[in-house]
């Protein structure tokens, strides 16, 4: 009699097993035979498998058209801004180095867009290499011919003779025609390119630059929140033989447009005698973060148009650095121009490296502070600190 309960348990287990088998056999959710292949990482690329796509009769929705500076490219909390680079196809590997510097030190955390501009169409290699390196969206634009050619009022024979004379004098880029077109374009047109029109701020990046320190904040956000219009990391004196008549053109502009000259401006950075002469100080424009809205303003466009018609981009060799610097110095208030001491930077042959040892350690810098250019005799950064009554950073006096 003691075996009765045992048999009852066996019968109960058998009944439960039959019930489970019956439910599984009647289920409308079949177990996939190829479950192993479905779990392959290769299938994660598409949210819809190829077999599912074949059975989807509905036409696919068109992709959202992304335009530079649109809501599609500016996540919440990020400023409407872009990096911008003027480059040739042959610059691809040099600009690749620059992109890695910018991405590793800053943009991998922010994913800002990058606009590339060229007077010729970009080739596939340039596009593939740069797109693969930039964490944000990339855009490629061709410069309109009218922005990279001689305006009607320029005597091209006279311009050619000037290039030949400067070449004989061994003035750097003095005999270069393309360099003059580049300087004119950077001075008056890059911010008018259709790809740039929807952005508010830009950060200019050139081939073969280095960023020596981590950038632990968003410079674009600082510019916007503190109402800065222009910024720099290096400043120096311009080569006078390239700009002998530039200040005369500037003074003529100031006389014709006093409404464009700001009170509390940075004239003291540009001139030692209240504007009578130019001391040749300028911000080095191969690094600059600035306001595109300011460059597109009437005051700046009037300024560029006046200089452009005077012909110095071609009859001399006016650079975009003094052109931008003078504009900022006379048309902006001093507090609207910012010095980024924290952004350690190199462009041949000059280095900006923070003098504070603690800052270099905190920002994981790898620059040699003895190579810092800021406080050397040919730099104008001391003058910038002086006119703003700013205290020089720790360690600066040791390098003076």
Curated annotation (Swiss-Prot):
It is a single-pass type II membrane protein. Optimum pH is 7.0. Pfam families: Glyco_transf_15. GO terms for cellular component: Golgi apparatus; Golgi membrane. Its main location: Golgi. It is found in: Golgi apparatus membrane. Disruption phenotype: Results in thinner hyphal cell walls and shows increased sensitivity to cell wall stress such as exposure to calcofluor white and Congo red. Results in an unstable cell wall at elevated temperatures (over 37 degrees Celsius). Shows an increased sensitivity to azole antifungals and attenuated virulence in a murine infection model. Does not affect cell growth, conidiation, conidial morphology, conidium survival, conidial germination, nor the adhesion of conidia to host epithelial cells. Keywords: Glycoprotein, Glycosyltransferase, Golgi apparatus, Membrane, Signal-anchor, Transferase, Transmembrane, Transmembrane helix. Gene3D superfamilies: Spore Coat Polysaccharide Biosynthesis Protein SpsA, Chain A (3.90.550.10). SUPFAM superfamilies: Nucleotide-diphospho-sugar transferases. The keyword Transmembrane helix applies. Glycans are attached at residue 80. One of its GO terms (molecular function) is GDP-Man:Man3GlcNAc2-PP-Dol alpha-1,2-mannosyltransferase activity. Alpha-1,2-mannosyltransferase involved in the elongation of N-glycans and synthesis of the second mannose residue of O-glycans. Catalyzes the transfer of mannose to mannose and alpha-(1,2)-mannobiose as substrates but hardly transfers mannose to alpha-(1,3)-mannobiose or alpha-(1,6)-mannobiose. Transfers the C1-hydroxyl group of the mannose residue from GDP-mannose by dehydration-condensation with the C2-hydroxyl group of the terminal mannose residue. Required for the maintenance of the fungal cell wall and full virulence, but not for the adhesion of conidia to host epithelial cells. This is Alpha-1,2-mannosyltransferase 1. The lineage of its organism: Eukaryota, Fungi, Dikarya, Ascomycota, Pezizomycotina.
């Amino acid at each position: 009699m003691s075996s009765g309960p045992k048999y009852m348990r066996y019968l109960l287990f058998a009944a439960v097993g039959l019930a489970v088998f019956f439910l599984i056999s009647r289920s409308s959710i079949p177990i996939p035979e190829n479950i192993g292949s479905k779990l392959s990482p290769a299938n994660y690329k598409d949210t819809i498998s190829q077999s599912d796509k074949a059975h989807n009769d509905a036409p696919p929705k068109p992709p959202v058209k992304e335009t530079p500076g649109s809501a599609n490219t500016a996540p919440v909390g990020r400023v409407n801004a872009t990096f911008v680079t003027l480059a040739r196809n042959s610059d691809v590997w040099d600009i690749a180095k620059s992109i890695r510097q910018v991405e590793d030190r800053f943009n991998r955390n922010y994913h800002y867009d990058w606009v590339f501009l060229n007077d010729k169409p970009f080739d596939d290699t340039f596009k593939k290499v740069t797109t693969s390196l930039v964490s944000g969206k990339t855009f490629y634009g061709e410069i309109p011919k009218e922005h990279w050619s001689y305006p009607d009022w320029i005597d091209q024979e006279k311009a050619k003779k000037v290039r030949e004379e400067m070449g004989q004098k061994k003035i750097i880029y003095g005999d270069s025609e393309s360099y003059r077109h580049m300087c004119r374009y950077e001075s008056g047109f890059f911010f008018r390119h259709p790809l740039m029109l929807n952005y508010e701020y830009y950060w200019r990046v050139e081939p073969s630059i280095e960023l020596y320190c981590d950038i632990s904040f968003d410079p674009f956000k600082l510019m916007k929140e503190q109402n800065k219009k222009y910024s720099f990391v290096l400043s120096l004196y311009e080569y006078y033989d390239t700009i002998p008549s530039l200040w005369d053109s500037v003074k003529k502009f100031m006389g014709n447009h006093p409404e464009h000259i700001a009170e509390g401006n940075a004239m003291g950075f540009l001139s030692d005698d209240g504007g009578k002469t130019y001391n040749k100080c300028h911000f080095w424009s191969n690094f600059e973060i600035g306001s595109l809205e300011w460059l597109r303003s009437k005051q700046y466009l009037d300024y560029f148009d006046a200089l452009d018609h005077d012909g110095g981009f071609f009859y001399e060799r006016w650079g975009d650095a003094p052109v931008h610097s003078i504009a900022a110095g006379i048309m902006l208030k001093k507090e609207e121009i910012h010095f980024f001491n924290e952004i350690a930077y190199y462009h041949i042959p000059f280095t900006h490296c923070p003098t504070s040892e603690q800052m270099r350690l905190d920002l994981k810098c790898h620059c040699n502070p003895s190579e810092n250019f800021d406080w050397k005799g040919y730099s104008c950064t001391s003058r910038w600190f002086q006119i703003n009554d700013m205290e020089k950073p720790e360690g600066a006096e040791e390098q003076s």
